[in-house]
A protein has these predicted regions:
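Double-stranded DNA-binding cores of transcription factors and transposases
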Residues: 7-43
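Basic, flexible linker segments flanking DNA-binding modules
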Residues: 8-12, 47-141, 232-233, 290-294
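Residue-level signal for the short linker/turn that defines the boundary of a DNA-recognition helix
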Residues: 29-31, 86, 256
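Mobile genetic element proteins and their domesticated derivatives, centered on retroelements
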Residues: 35-36, 46, 76, 91, ...
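Mobile-element integrase/transposase regions
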Residues: 96-97, 101-102, 106-162, 168, ...
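Acidic/histidine-rich, metal-coordinating catalytic segments
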Residues: 178, 195-211, 236, 283-287
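RNase H-like polynucleotidyl transferase catalytic core
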Residues: 200-205, 219-238, 252-258
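C-terminal domain-tail junction helix/linker
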Residues: 219-221, 244-324
Length: 324
């Protein structure tokens, strides 16, 4: 059995395809995509069929002019297959921002649930050990820490300064040596990236932070220094979670030498700041919040969803008229 024309497939044929996929998976262990490839059915088409309330192309149900289009369902399923580890909420706003499909979270949830494509993502658990201070604007509080990076049979040290309000990486440096002088130099560099700010600086009790060089920079700029609880990394949870993200997205592969490692980390930082959507930021990027633009993004997203809804109404009305 091989389908040549997918533009108009009878309901019984669709049902047969789904039955074949299920039986083949149960009896031989073949994955869905392998069976679909043998049948000549694209995965996006299959999941669009599966997501429909009924298999018939034309139904007798009441006309709903704002009903999601079949091609939008297929696009949502196809997008989810490209990002299998990402939850539906983040997928929703990734698609809206990229102009793939502009619908709300509940619609994406229903489509993916019907297609059995909901990602079972790991829910983050807020740390009970973080300090109660909650910044209300960028650069009121920075968190800093060092992450060990293994490259070419030795360790380097990734020093990062994370803005607590926006999760933006204000400054980073891959250090060759880890000491007070190196850290104080990079703290000074971080302060120079945003002139006139006096953030609270949160760090652990490591000797690279607790020393005369770092203390001198803090005193010169009249900063408030916050030391976390000893042997309690959760107290610095914001930067700890960032470090975990770097490890996860790099797969701990930073290249074969220091210069390659710098390049890998620079790309990761750009992706983290400018592209990666954060649940705690309303599924926006750290750069959006650090630049004070979340309201602009909210308005643009609302505009896109409204425009897509109007377009969906027009298309549905045309199709209903043609089907009459």
């Amino acid at each position: 059995m091989r389908l040549e024309d997918l533009s108009r497939v009878p309901a019984e044929t669709k049902a047969a395809v789904m039955e074949i996929v299920t039986l083949t998976k149960n009896r031989s262990g073949w994955r869905v995509y392998r069976t679909l490839a043998a049948l000549g059915v694209p995965r996006s088409v299959y999941y669009a069929w599966k997501a429909r309330e009924r298999l018939e192309d034309r139904t007798g149900k009441p006309l709903r002019v704002y009903e999601i289009l079949a091609e939008e369902r297929a696009a949502i399923c196809d997008f989810a297959l490209q990002y299998p580890k990402i939850g539906y909420r983040k997928l929703t706003w990734m698609m809206v921002d990229a102009g793939v499909v502009c619908v709300g979270e509940s619609t994406v949830y229903r489509v993916l649930s019907d297609a059995d494509l909901l990602s079972r993502w790991k829910r983050s658990v807020p740390s009970s050990g973080e300090y109660n201070f909650r910044p209300k604007a960028p650069n009121q509080q920075w968190h800093t820490d060092v992450m060990y990076v293994w490259v070419a049979a030795r360790f380097y040290f990734l020093l990062s300064f994370v803005d607590a309000y926006s999760r933006y990486i204000v400054h980073h440096k891959l250090l060759i040596t880890l000491d007070g002088r190196s850290v104080s130099t990079e703290l000074q560099a971080a302060l120079e990236t945003v002139e006139g700010v006096k953030p609270r600086v949160v760090h652990d009790h490591g000797s690279e932070f607790v020393n005369r060089d770092v203390a001198a920079v803090i005193k010169t700029h009249n900063l408030i220094e916050i030391k976390t609880k000893p042997r309690h990394p959760e107290s610095n949870g914001i930067v700890e979670r960032f470090n975990a993200t770097v490890r996860d997205e790099s797969n701990n592969d930073y290249g074969d030498n220091y210069l390659q490692a710098e390049g890998v980390i620079a790309r990761l930082m750009h992706h983290y700041n400018e592209e990666r959507l954060h649940a705690t930021l309303g599924y926006m990027t750290p750069a959006t919040w650090h630049r004070g633009q979340p309201d602009e993004v909210r308005r643009e997203r609302a505009r896109r969803i409204a425009a897509a809804r109007t377009n969906r109404k027009t298309i549905n009305q045309q199709r209903f008229k043609q089907a009459a």
